[in-house]
């Protein structure tokens, strides 16, 4: 199973819908960038907000109160 271009290997889960974010999985072809999208909770506290881990062709854009980290390995997400 090839890892690396054109395939990435990233953590892919949403803390809101899944508590198991422990295993990186192969991304779709040419979705090589791993990202973590941080979103604040209902009280707008970033420290206790939820995270979405995924992979894409490019990094997603965070909303006004969120932030994104992005890289080429699952170590950053």
UniProtKB/Swiss-Prot annotation:
Sorted UniProt keywords: Acetylcholine receptor inhibiting toxin, Disulfide bond, Ion channel impairing toxin, Neurotoxin, Postsynaptic neurotoxin, Pyrrolidone carboxylic acid, Secreted, Toxin
Protein name as annotated: Alpha-colubritoxin
Record's subcellular location: Secreted
S-S bonds: 10-34, 13-21, 27-55, 59-70, 71-76
Tissue distribution: Expressed by the venom gland.
Pfam families with a match to the protein in the record: Toxin_cobra-type
Gene Ontology cellular component annotations, sorted alphabetically: extracellular region
GO molecular function term, any single one: toxin activity
Domain of life the protein comes from: Eukaryota
Alphabetized SUPFAM superfamilies for the sequence: Snake toxin-like
Family the entry assigns: Belongs to the three-finger toxin family. Ancestral subfamily. Boigatoxin sub-subfamily.
Gene3D superfamilies: CD59
Function: Potent postsynaptic neurotoxin. Displays readily reversible competitive antagonism at the nicotinic acetylcholine receptor (nAChR).
Main localisation: secreted
Pyrrolidone carboxylic acid modification, residue list: 1
């Amino acid at each position: 199973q090839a890892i690396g271009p054109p395939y990435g290997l990233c953590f892919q889960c949403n803390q809101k819908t899944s508590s198991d974010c422990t295993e990186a999985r192969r991304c779709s072809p040419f979705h090589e960038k791993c990202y973590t999208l941080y979103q604040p909770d209902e009280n707008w506290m970033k420290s206790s907000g939820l995270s979405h881990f995924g992979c894409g062709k490019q990094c997603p854009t965070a909303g006004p109160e969120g932030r994104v980290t992005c890289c080429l390995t699952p170590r950053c997400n």
